[in-house]
From Swiss-Prot:
EC primary class: hydrolase
CDD domains with a match to the protein in the record: Orn
EC annotation from Swiss-Prot or TrEMBL: 3.1.15.-
Name of the protein this chain belongs to: Oligoribonuclease
Domain of life: Bacteria
Organism: Pseudomonas putida (strain ATCC 47054 / DSM 6125 / CFBP 8728 / NCIMB 11950 / KT2440)
Name of one Pfam family that matches: RNase_T
Gene3D superfamilies: Ribonuclease H-like superfamily/Ribonuclease H
GO MF term set: 3'-5'-RNA exonuclease activity; nucleic acid binding
Subcellular location: Cytoplasm
One record GO biological process: DNA metabolic process
Gene symbol of the encoding locus: orn
């Protein structure tokens, strides 16, 4: 059910960090209410790219995405970047009106840069504001390092896992740092 207070969480896995030369290889979304309760999980999409594109990944991405099985899923996928964008927007339209939710996640500006370059319609679906959990992590590192250090992430570098961790991390900071 559409609600303008719902929050859209997104995570992308990419072949690297430069949106001009790297591409999105996996994406996932979760919609929560304003209290961070999960309402729905969107499609988890491995986006097809050629072996030539995948061969340009650096050592870290090659190792990480190979070990997680993502590289193989990308090779086997039949979903294009445009199809992934359309599927994701169709899911989001059920839960949040266009332009209402900030883009939510960890280091979300990086994801937004890739969306702006490769999936402009999806990037435009979000409000211009960002809800970046990394901001609280950086503040906690300076003002309450024990709070930051008490949250442990799994670091699977799979999009859906990363979103779930981002939501859990924000809950952690809400309880132990902001203390609401």
């Amino acid at each position: 059910m559409q609600n303008p207070q719902n929050l859209i969480w997104i995570d992308l896995e990419m072949t690297g960090l430069d949106p001009d030369s790297d591409v999105i290889i996996e994406m996932a979304t979760i919609v929560t209410d304003s209290e961070l309760n999960t309402l729905a999980e969107g499609p988890v999409i491995a986006i097809h790219h050629s072996d030539e594109v995948l061969a340009r990944m650096d050592e870290w991405n090659t190792r990480t995405h190979g070990a997680s099985g993502l590289t193989q899923r990308v090779r086997e996928s039949k979903v294009s970047m445009a199809e992934a964008e359309a599927q994701t927007i169709a899911f989001l339209e059920q839960w949040v009106p266009k332009g209402k939710s900030p883009i939510c996640g960890n280091s979300i500006c990086q994801d937004r840069r890739f969306l702006y370059r490769h999936m402009r319609n999806l990037e435009n679906y979000f409000h211009y504001r960002n809800l970046d959990v990394s901001t609280l992590k950086e503040l906690a590192a300076r003002w309450a390092p024990d709070v930051r250090d008490s949250f442990k992430k799994g670091n699977t570098h799979l999009a859906l896992d990363d979103i779930r961790e981002s939501i859990a991390e924000l809950r952690h900071y809400r309880e132990h740092f902001i203390k609401l």
